[in-house]
């Protein structure tokens, strides 16, 4: 699973 920056 890739690391995505959603800024939650």
Curated annotation (Swiss-Prot):
Its main location: secreted. Position 8 could be leucine amide or isoleucine amide. The keyword Secreted applies. It is found in: Secreted. Keywords: Amidation, Neuropeptide, Secreted. The keyword Secreted applies. GO terms for biological process: neuropeptide signaling pathway. One of its GO terms (cellular component) is extracellular region. The modification Leucine amide is found at residue 8. Belongs to the allatostatin family. May act as a neurotransmitter or neuromodulator. This is Allatostatin-2. It comes from Rhodnius prolixus (Triatomid bug).
